[in-house]
Swiss-Prot record:
Coiled coil segments of this chain: none
Primary location: cytoplasm
Biological function: Required for maturation of 30S ribosomal subunits.
Name used for this protein in its record: Ribosome maturation factor RimP
Family membership noted in the UniProt record: Belongs to the RimP family.
Species assigned in the record: Rhizobium etli (strain CIAT 652)
Length: 198
């Protein structure tokens, strides 16, 4: 999947209510800057806080990127004025134990632990935890790490049933996330050098 494909890939898990209105305002700005929206939430902490999670199409997000995104979406939010109270704007990367919101997230993080919830019962459960062993266009398969008596060790979860999913922090995940970040930074540096030579 190319960065252009990633840019256009829809999110499986989206917001509702006010959070959806905020996402509708913010997402076009992010896409225009080469970023993807992961999640937006209004939280009641330290007064009202609007939490925006985003990343570049290659999966990276620096502190400088967070500043740029904040500076770009702040004036748009001021004009649209979707919130009638004072709030703090917090822009961040999704982090290592990130929310899984696109099909490509399940492909990218195959082999890692995830916990998820479904909107329907699958094998008498709605909550699952396990290693992603396979992902395709329709869903993903988990190898459970906590099996109840009588349950199959693997469970297939269709993307249409997914209501929430998040990576679980492990040493392997930290190692692979750092490796992916290092590779993305090296590729960006090489691209910058090539652009300067032209």
């Amino acid at each position: 999947m190319t960065n252009a494909d990633n840019e256009l890939e829809p999110r499986l898990i989206t917001e509702t209510g006010l959070d959806q209105r905020l996402a509708d305002i913010i997402e076009p700005v992010l896409v225009g800057m080469g970023f993807r929206l992961i999640r937006v939430r209004m939280l009641n902490q330290n007064g009202m806080t609007m939490q925006v999670m985003a990343e570049r199409n290659d999966g990276t997000m620096t502190v400088q990127d967070c500043e740029e995104v904040s500076m770009a979406i702040s004036p748009v939010l001021d004009v649209e004025d979707p919130i009638d109270k004072e709030y703090h704007l917090e822009v961040s990367s999704p982090g290592i134990d990130r929310p899984m919101v696109r099909k490509s997230d399940f492909v990218r993080w195959q082999g890692h632990l995830v916990k998820c919830e479904t909107s329907i019962m699958i094998g008498n459960r709605k909550r699952f935890r396990g290693k992603i062993v396979e992902a395709d266009a329709d869903g993903f398969t988990l190898e459970r790490d906590q099996i109840a008596y009588g349950e199959e060790p693997k469970v297939s979860i269709p993307f249409t049933a997914l209501s929430d999913a998040k990576l679980i922090l492990t040493d392997d995940l930290i190692r692979d996330a750092l490796r992916a970040d290092k590779l993305a930074k090296a590729q960006a540096a090489n691209q910058n050098e090539a652009d300067e030579q032209e």
